[in-house]
Amino acid sequence: VVPQGGNTGLVGGSVPLQGEVVLSLRRLEALSAVDQAAGQVTVGAGVTLARLQDHAGAAGLAFGVDLGARDSATVGGMIATNAGGLHFLRFGGMRDQVQGLEAVLADGTIIRHLDGLWKDNTGYDWGRLLCGSEGTLAVITAARLRLVPAYAERAVALLAFMHVTDAIDAVWELRRAVDSLAAAELFLGSGLELVCERLDLPKPFPETHQAYLLVECAGKADPTDELAAAVAQLGRLVDAAVADPGRRQLLWAYRERHPEAINLVGPPHKLDVTLPAARIAEFVEQVPSIVSEVAPGARCWLFGHVADGNIHVNITGPAPDDEASDEAVLAYVASLGGSISAEHGIGTAKKAWLHLNRSPAEVALFRAIKSALDPEGVLNPHVLLPDAP
């Protein structure tokens, strides 16, 4: 049985491979009234992120996770992959939003813990175990989620730098100086040029620079002055644009529409990695040459949630079944002490490289947990765990 939500995953986690039954959860669309006292809501697994955001907003609250695929991504899939997204810096990922779950085990047993108590020290936190389990342990059918304050006042700025290192240094300076910082996104001059050219967007600055940061602040009071003051203190900043409310969406488009523009070049190999803070700049600067060594002529497109170390690596040029560039990048990530999967999960696409991050003892533990909850191997049998030797 392969559980399936909005089909926005990028590692094949909800794709049947050998005649499995697809279990669509899209019709589990129940939404409870928002519990204003607790700041929580109970939702069905098939509710889209956009619908959840609208529901929370109507109650004067917000949901802490946001994704570019908000119109299609569903709550169940986001929990199953422990999605991160644009505001991880401020609110964390899906595991941090889950107060309780309802799920169905492989034998049909329904387990439910949706009371939403903030403190409940009564045994194993099985709900958090299911976050990131990719449908291998149980089928998530509903969730109790925490909501966050709706920060109506926002400030967005696009910052340009001559060097990647300067942009990375600026992130840490802004994190220290700006309490209201909600997002910090990195992309490169090559990516910005591609987005503007392929999607007919105006260039934000007269000249193209090597690296850009898109930063957003959010608060009850207007954070524009706080952000502007911090930006004024940044070293090696070569240009900046602080958006008025009418231009915020355009500045975000330069970052959010990267995948759309890259797809117009050709089918990309998509990698989603995390680096230690001290190695991010080195990775961004070196990975194109790492790719070129094994795939001459390939193009590397880099962007991501830099404040939490998450870089998306898109590679165009190699054939879909040519994994030499994937192998080279993921091995390089591991050599720097990073993770081969930041937020997309392992699925079928990355399980061959799980050993780069997880020891044999850890993989054995994973198998033991899987065997305990799904002894017949019914649930999503071909994802996450490497094929048995």
Predicted regions, residues:
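Noncatalytic alpha-helical scaffold of FAD-dependent oxidoreductases
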Residues: 1-389
